[in-house]
């Protein structure tokens, strides 16, 4: 029996990206199925409804990268649906609504949350964002 894994890599140059790896459970051998080179660093990934959603960490010195991506899962390969640039914002967590209409992205480093409209597994548009500016009980810890 084969198991498929999606691995994100912060490697340099063409080593960064998404790796699709199969594990043959009988022989305990891994095999590389596909490597998708990405412009930014892929970080958090989730799979919902045969779609891989991914958060990208900005890799640009101009701070104009980062964002989200959507890939259709077809057998053992990923087919890009679209990427959504966030102009320097990088997200650290993703969640898809139960009805598959919304993608929620959060960044605990800066205390922000954004919501995106999904249409046929494509990231259509940002529909809202909030930045938290509260204070916690421990003033020595990050206050986001």
Q: Where are the language model's segments positioned?
A:
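Residue position within the beta-strands of beta-propeller blades
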Residues: 7, 53-55, 105
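Asp-box/WD-like beta-propeller blade repeats and closely related beta-sheet repeat scaffolds
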Residues: 78-144
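A short loop-to-beta-strand structural motif that recurs across blades of beta-propeller domains
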Residues: 17-19, 66-69, 112-114
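Short glycine/acidic-enriched loop and turn motifs that connect beta-strands
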Residues: 11-14, 58-62, 109-112
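Residue-level detector of Asp-centered blade-edge/turn motifs that repeat once per structural unit
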Residues: 1, 47-50, 96-100
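Short loop/turn segments that connect beta-strands within beta-propeller blades
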Residues: 24-26, 73-76, 118-121
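An edge-strand/N-cap motif at the start of beta-rich repeat modules
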Residues: 1-13, 17-22
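Conserved positions at the start
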Residues: 40-42, 90-91
């Amino acid at each position: 029996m084969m198991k498929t894994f999606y691995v994100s890599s912060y490697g340099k140059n063409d080593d960064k990206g998404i790796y699709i790896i199969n594990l043959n459970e009988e022989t305990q051998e891994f095999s590389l199925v596909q490597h998708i080179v990405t412009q930014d660093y892929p970080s958090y990934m989730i799979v919902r409804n045969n779609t891989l959603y991914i958060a990208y960490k900005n890799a640009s010195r101009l701070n104009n990268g980062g964002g989200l991506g959507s890939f259709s899962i077809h057998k053992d390969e990923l087919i890009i649906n679209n990427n959504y640039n966030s102009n320097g914002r990088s997200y650290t967590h993703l969640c898809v609504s139960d009805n598959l209409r919304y993608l929620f992205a959060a960044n605990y480093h800066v205390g922000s949350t954004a919501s995106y409209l999904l249409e046929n597994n494509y990231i259509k548009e940002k529909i809202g964002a909030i930045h938290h500016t509260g204070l916690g009980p421990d003033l020595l810890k990050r206050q986001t």
